[in-house]
Regions:
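Thiamine diphosphate
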Residues: 1-126, 130-253
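Glycine- and Gly-Pro-enriched alpha-helical subdomains that act as flexible
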Residues: 257-258
Length: 258
């Protein structure tokens, strides 16, 4: 497995000290390492993957150095616009390194919403002309691939990608964070909201734990799931799904949990 500290240090030797992206479970150990070791002003958790690409572009314009952009492969679609119309060598030619978690890799067990994206991830990189490598699962070859792809990015003035398989990074113990002063956790919050809603309210819940906890609340209380739409994919788009429902059915109240 890949040592997160050695990989982080290798990025520094390549001149990469700015990080932007959208967290991914496959990259969790490395993202935690970034959070613990990069200064606050050099690490931005972006609103979406396209915004992360733009942040990396701005960093390069100001410093002349490439940045690292991390994301799940499900976010590649959000990143395509700035990749091909801003950073591409035929436009502004902005070097950057993408670290892409490979959910839904063919032949690897995963959730259904990841199957299609996993199958097309390498082909999507090919289609937009972005050089990529599958990141090796051991530290030394991973660092060698990292250095080679950064060299390509800088010499050719273009985005490049390293695609990361599941369980590539070794576990990392994140530094302890100050205890939250909030007394209501996410599970209790979801239950509190769901309990207070009238029975005619349609509910759209976002990707991840919020949808899981809404589902579990309905099951535990013996309620049906018919008025809930659990957004298992399309991270970041739950609010617009809810808006689409509300515009089409203005007589029915719609709540979005995001």
């Amino acid at each position: 497995m890949i040592d997160t500290g050695m990989f982080f240090d290798a990025l520094a030797t390549c001149g990469i000290d700015f990080f932007a992206g959208v967290p991914d479970s496959l990259l969790k150990p490395f993202c935690a390492h970034i959070s613990d070791h990069a200064p606050e002003h050099r690490h931005v958790i972006a609103a979406n993957e396209g915004a992360a690409i733009a942040l990396a572009a701005g960093h390069h314009l100001a410093t002349g150095r490439p940045a690292l952009v991390y994301m799940q492969n499900s976010g590649l679609g959000n990143a395509v616009n700035p990749l091909v119309s801003l950073a591409d060598p035929d436009v502004y030619g902005i070097p950057m390194l993408l670290l892409v978690g490979w959910r839904g890799e063919p032949g690897v067990k995963d959730e259904p919403q990841h199957f299609k994206q996993g199958a097309v991830t390498p082909a999507l990189c090919d289609a937009i002309g972005m050089p990529y490598r599958i990141l090796p699962g051991e530290t030394e070859p991973a660092i060698a691939s990292l250095k080679e792809m950064v060299r390509v990015a800088v010499e050719q003035n273009r985005p490049v990608a390293l695609i990361v398989r599941a369980n590539s990074f070794a576990k990392y113990q994140a530094a302890s964070r100050p205890a939250s002063s909030f007394t209501l956790n996410r599970e209790a919050t979801v239950a509190c909201i769901a309990e207070s809603l009238p029975p005619d309210v349609a509910v759209v819940s976002t990707t991840g734990h919020i949808s899981r906890e809404l589902f579990e609340y309905r099951a535990q209380t013996g309620q049906g799931h018919g008025r809930d739409f659990l957004t298992v994919g399309a991270m970041g788009h739950a609010s617009q799904i809810a808006l689409g429902i509300a515009l089409a059915r203005p007589e029915r109240p719609v709540v979005c949990l995001d």
